[in-house]
Amino acid sequence: GTFTDATKTLKCTPPTELAPEMLILVSDNGKKVWKYAATNSYGNGGHGGAGADFNGPGVVGGNWWGVETPDGLADQLGHVPGGTATGDEAAGAYMVFTEDGVVTSYKPTGEAIRSGKFEVKNYDPERSSGWELGKLVTSEPALLFPWMINGGGKGVTEFDIMYFTPQAMTLVYTNGQASGGWGEITHWCFIGGSPDPLTMEGTWTYDANGYGKGGHGGAGADFNG
């Protein structure tokens, strides 16, 4: 008989370790969903120049106005080119950042709206500049509702990162306003979560009356609220 010794050489490339700022955006899963914050997800304010005032999720220094809930974005189509709804004005819209540097915005149905490349520049978690933590730059206006307030439909591609954790992100567009000059700026507040949008519908909490006992009456219709 014959004996065949078959060998095959495999080239294994270890995954590149992600930078800290990329881990925040895409997680160690390599992709991550971001949605509108529950309040103040889009609005405007004055450029007060103090980045430290952006000290929590949805907290905007110099805030003048913001949508009370994401549903309010449907009333802000005057800032969109042509005033046309594209789907990201819906409360359930979301965007996905991936480790290969692509961000895609989606309608609540999962249909893609727009996509582009992204990168984080000059990330400085110490905020040495006194203002931003870094810049989030996209190749085109690809984020959720990326329109400058009172900008005549101007799409934003360079954002100042003001608050940045795995759970929440606040972005600002200054439109060249002088720091501390109180000129109008636009802000966006997002929350981050699972790599799967279907798992981000809400947070599980206990109901105040959520634990107890009772008799098995057999009427499922009695569980009506």
Range-by-range predicted roles:
Residues 12-35, 192-205:
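N-terminal helix-cap/turn-to-beta initiation motif at the start of protein domains
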Residues 69-166, 209-217, 222-225:
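Contiguous, well-ordered beta-strand patches that form the walls/edges
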Residues 176-194:
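A recurrent domain-boundary module in secreted/ectodomain proteins
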Residues 160-161, 168-182:
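Short, exposed beta-strand-loop hairpins at the edges of beta-sheets
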Residues 51, 56-58:
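Acidic, glycine-anchored loop motifs typical of Ca2+
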Residues 1-16, 180-183:
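Short, exposed coil/turn segments at beta-strand boundaries within extracellular/luminal domains
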Residues 41-48, 211-217:
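Short, solvent-exposed loop/turn elements at domain surfaces
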Residues 31-37, 41-45:
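Surface-exposed interaction/gating patches
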